[in-house]
Amino acid sequence: MFWFYQGVATYLGQTLGVETHITQSQYDPLQDPMMLQDQIDIAFICGLPFVQLNRIIPGQLQALVAPVMQASRYQNRPVYFSDIIVKASRNFRFEDLAGKTFCYNDPGSNSGYNLVRYRLMQSQYPSSFFGKVMQSGSHQRSIELVVEGIADCAAIDSTVLEQQLRFQPELANHLRVIESIGPCPMPPIIISSRLANDSQKLQSILCQPNTELASNSMKQAQIRRYVSVQTEDYAPILRMYDDVIQAGYGILG
């Protein structure tokens, strides 16, 4: 989706009459020096590191907008799911994944890791439920590992899975979603509190995009629209995170 983020950054720059620079961070969000030192104005970020950063640097960041995806499953709301996938030939239910190999993108991912921990905790399965747990580095790689049979299952951001199925429709013959965890607040665009006075203007620009952004980049990304969100909207993610940590589900496997 970096191509889409570039499109949004270009649109903001053109609309505001400023030069924009977008980079893909190589750091864990919780250790990103630019983020921690308030050197980033606007960021696209997963909901879990966002709420965690608000504990580390309280008041420095605030949620601005979040996308509403086009698919009917999102019910015209800024939400998404964690889709649990298995190989199409495997007749698994979630409970059948006990002792199997689970693949996730990153331990800081809400959809790839945190929601799975919460699902195990809610069902009173142990943190050692999976026989083997492996990190892939990305949702796309997790999908590949399941297709290749290296992993039995993976937790995938539903919007990423939909995007991959559009780009590679043949994947539908190799994968099956056995359960969807959620809905959960959609990853937001956030801003530094230094820009708080401009937040309404930025929200208006993104929630009422020009034809080029709406018809090209947003349509291709299957985004129906952007809506304004508040930092408080992401509190449920932090509560789930706190619950799994307190219950001893910090590390799976």
Locate each region found by the language model.
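Short hydrophobic/aromatic-enriched beta-strand-loop microsegments
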Residues: 61-66, 129, 154, 174-177
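A short beta-strand-loop structural module common to alpha/beta enzyme folds
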Residues: 19-27
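Bilobed "Venus flytrap"/periplasmic-binding protein-like clamshell domains
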Residues: 1-15, 25, 48, 76-143, ...
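An extracytoplasmic/periplasmic, membrane-proximal ligand-sensing/linker region
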Residues: 2-3, 7, 184, 191, ...
